[in-house]
């Protein structure tokens, strides 16, 4: 356990992903939430007042953050002193705007860990699953040099939520000496993955939607970056694997399912 917890900020704290961040970080052994930020619509309110009518989780709003005043995500001057790490669940109107916002925090010396997809395909931004590719953090000095960032500032991202369970198994097979060359995956993704709008859409509750915009591209490309290698210019994608994906939205509140088939280089796994 750390002698002193790391003070953190949560961006997009009033949304579904942000609420999960707040819940997961409550009483965390490493992190202490001292700042929450969101859009202008929520800024200036106590966190409790901003989320009480739309709190998604079954557990109560953590007491430690209830009275924190929500900061506008663009109000950098109001970030409390001592904050060194930022967890971002913020999605702006365009991916380019989100990319700029994330690097603005990095430029100001903050380590920003993003849940958004805006920077997942940025070559010098690591997309890390700790059990698989912690060494991709080695690209951070390259990112800092490329973008003239201070020594404490960088952007790192997590991958798409629907791939996180099965990709760990695929990684274990690769490390055990097996060589998958083709992967076919069908995802059954919960309504919560579409945010508040997905949960409130009555039509979605009784239907299976056979297409989710952008999800198939993420599912097919993100694992190649995770299995990739660090080069002098950034992350070089793994090239010896072909992934084909079909992503569907199903009437389940929370929790994704994936049906995965693999073809291996050798006919036998013995």
Language model feature labels by segment:
Residues 179, 191-270:
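Charged docking surfaces used in two-component/phosphorelay signaling
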Residues 1-210, 242, 266:
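N-terminal Rossmann-like NAD(P) cofactor-binding subdomain of oxidoreductases
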């Amino acid at each position: 356990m750390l002698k002193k917890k790391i003070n953190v900020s949560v961006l997009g704290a009033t949304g579904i992903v942000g609420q999960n961040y707040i819940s997961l970080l409550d009483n965390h052994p490493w992190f202490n939430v001292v700042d929450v930020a969101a859009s202008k619509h929520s800024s200036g309110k106590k966190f409790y007042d901003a989320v009480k009518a739309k709190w998604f989780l079954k557990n109560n709003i953590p007491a430690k953050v209830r009275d924190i005043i929500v900061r506008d995500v663009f109000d950098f001057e109001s970030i409390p002193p001592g904050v060194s790490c930022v967890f971002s669940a913020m999605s702006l109107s365009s991916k380019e705007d989100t990319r700029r916002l994330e690097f603005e925090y990095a430029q100001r010396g903050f380590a920003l860990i993003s849940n958004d997809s805006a920077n997942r395909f940025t070559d010098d931004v690591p997309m890390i699953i700790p059990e698989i590719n912690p060494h991709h953090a080695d690209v951070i000095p390259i990112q800092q040099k490329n973008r003239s960032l201070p020594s404490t500032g960088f952007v790192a991202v997590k991958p798409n939520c629907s791939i996180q369970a099965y990709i760990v198994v695929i990684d274990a097979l690769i490390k055990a000496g097996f060589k998958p060359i083709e992967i076919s995956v069908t995802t059954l993704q919960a309504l919560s993955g579409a945010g508040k709008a997905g949960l409130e859409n009555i039509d979605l509750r009784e239907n299976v939607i056979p297409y989710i915009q952008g999800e198939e591209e993420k599912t097919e490309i993100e694992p190649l970056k995770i299995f990739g290698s660090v080069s002098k210019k950034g992350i070089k994608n793994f090239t010896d694997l072909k992934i084909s994906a079909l992503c569907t939205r199903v009437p389940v509140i929370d929790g994704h399912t994936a049906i995965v088939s693999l073809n291996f280089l050798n006919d036998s796994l013995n």
